[in-house]
A protein has these predicted regions:
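Arg/Lys-rich amphipathic alpha helix in sigma70-family domain 2
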Residues: 62-64, 78-96, 104-108
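Conserved RNAP core-binding helix
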Residues: 24-28, 32, 42-59, 157
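Sigma70-family region 2
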Residues: 13-14, 40, 53-68, 87-88
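Short, Lys/Arg-enriched C-terminal cap helix and immediately downstream tail that follows
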Residues: 64, 85-89, 143, 148, ...
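Helix-turn-helix DNA-binding module
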Residues: 4, 134-174
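Structural recognition of an alpha-helix C-terminal capping motif at a helix-to-coil junction
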Residues: 33, 47-54, 67-79
Length: 195
């Protein structure tokens, strides 16, 4: 942990409101993006992000400092997300069709900024980038929850295997195996969509 993180954690433990605001300013977008990509609904992701930060603020004393603060935040967010997905599944008797609907909502532009679209020039190329992002996000939304989590953490959030292991509590071999299966499933889904 960096000195800055150590001081921030100390201030959070002292229940310093400015430290809480700093925590949200520093990590809010990352946590929201993770939650949004896992759930596929902006409002749910916003609500869940608030719950995550409230939980973190209330339970900061449980943070041992063995890992980076951001890694612990991701773990709390991932756990909240899994619980919310289970709750929504029970509440709505969620089906594959509803996951498709979530992917379509995201594809309709209700999501985070486009992956890679900022690197493409020209209107026709921008449209291609947006379409590609929609296709990829729809395919990610169709993945099993555990596979979706490792893909989002590794390929979108660009976390190391070590950080993903700390967040998920899984051994590195399991993370790599799930990531391989998830990427294979994504490749298959993307190839089908190109036909």
């Amino acid at each position: 942990m960096s000195l800055r993180e150590i001081l921030l954690v100390r201030r959070l433990r002292e229940r310093d409101e400015k430290a809480f605001k700093e925590l949200i300013a520093t990590h809010g977008d990352q946590i929201y993006n993770l939650l949004y990509r896992m759930i596929g609904n902006q409002e749910e992701a916003k609500d869940l992000a608030q719950e995550v930060f409230i939980t973190v603020f209330k339970s900061i004393d449980q943070f041992r400092g063995d890992s980076k603060l951001s890694t612990w935040l991701y773990r709390v967010a991932a756990n909240h997300c899994k619980n919310r997905i289970k709750y929504l599944a029970r509440r709505h008797d969620r089906s594959t069709t509803e996951l498709d609907d979530a992917a379509e909502r995201h594809a309709a532009g209700q999501g985070a900024s486009p992956i890679g679209a900022g690197h493409i020039e020209g209107p026709d190329r921008v449209l291609e980038g947006v379409e590609l992002e929609r296709t990829v996000q729809a395919a990610i939304a169709e993945l099993e929850e555990d596979h979706r989590l490792v893909v989002v953490l590794r390929d979108i959030e660009e976390l190391s295997y070590e950080e993903i292991c700390e967040i998920t509590g899984l051994p590195e071999g399991t993370v790599k195996s799930r990531l391989h299966r998830a990427r294979s499933a994504l490749k298959e889904k993307l190839e089908k969509s190109q036909r």
